[in-house]
Amino acid sequence: MPPLDFEPLNEISILERSKPGTLFCFGHGFSSRALARRLIPKGWEVSGTCRDIGSKNILNNEGLLYKYDGININKEIYNAIDKSTHLLISIPPQVSGDPVLDLLSNENLNWNHLKWIGYISSTGVYGDAKGEWVHEDSVLKPATAINQRRVAIESAWLKLYKVKNLPIVIFRCVGIYGPGRNILISVKLGRSKRIEKPGLVFSRIHVDDLAQTLEASMLNPIPGEIYNVSDDLPSSPSEVVEYACGLLGITPPPLVPYYSAELSGIARGFYEANKRVSNKKIKVDLGVFLEYPDYKVGLNALLKE
């Protein structure tokens, strides 16, 4: 429930109307910060939540941060959402569900001022496709608990769109990489593994291409839609490690057969899902032109940064 002293803001100043938009991000992390870096120079106001920011809100070139423990939504956050035109949710599914979904489902609050509500999900909802291509209308076969929760939350969001006519858009993302989070860093630190599993391929997306996809949807929202977000070249994980090692002039780690590799339960589940993720819809419907169409282009760009 909202704080007792929460009062929705009814008046919008001339200054607010002159902005392209105001974005609030639940989970202002790797992906939403990349989006903020695109939007803020264009005049957008961006803010979001973070678990630990100290005692004060932080304002930087990636937006204003509000402390949020994942459970209690305070008055500051309510007011920030009330002033926003766009809302992005990138918080991973909780065992208890999605706290933001619970908030927007509240019958006592009116969120009709929101022009776009984006929810970042995962292509993990498709499960294992035996190396075949998956599209937005492919059968969902989540194999892990977290992806089963994602399917349930996606369904609840889409129900909210149908019942309350809120502008929900779902983005199913593959593995996201970019500055500060990529295989080049793992190779340099000696943490990369070269696991051999014949026929296995993964899809990836550079965080800046995810950001441009989100922006394209924000500017031309189609409520109720689902988009896969992926690059053009599904590739084997060992191939990517080898390429990264070549760029750095480092000898690749030894090739280890998957069935004898020492992997955590989460990592092993990751290697069990074999699929190629189609990105045709974001290109056709949103006009997205990938800046980093495959991992080779992406890693070469990161090497120069």
Could you say what each language-model-derived stretch is?
Residues 1, 293-305:
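Amphipathic terminal alpha-helices
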Residues 77-119:
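NAD(P)-cofactor binding segment of oxidoreductase domains
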Residues 151, 164-166, 176-189, 195, ...:
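Glycine/proline-rich active-site loop of Rossmann-fold NAD(P)-dependent oxidoreductases
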Residues 141-169:
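Active-site Tyr-X1-5-Lys
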Residues 103-145:
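Conserved Rossmann-fold NAD(P)-dependent oxidoreductase catalytic core, especially the SDR/UDP-sugar
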Residues 13, 213-214, 220-267:
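Mid/C-terminal beta-alpha module of Rossmann-like enzyme folds, strongest
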Residues 185-205, 209, 213:
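A conserved pocket-lining segment of Rossmann-fold NAD(P)-dependent short-chain dehydrogenase/reductase
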Residues 73, 242, 261-289:
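Conserved C-terminal active-site "lid" loop/helix of NAD(P)H-dependent oxidoreductases
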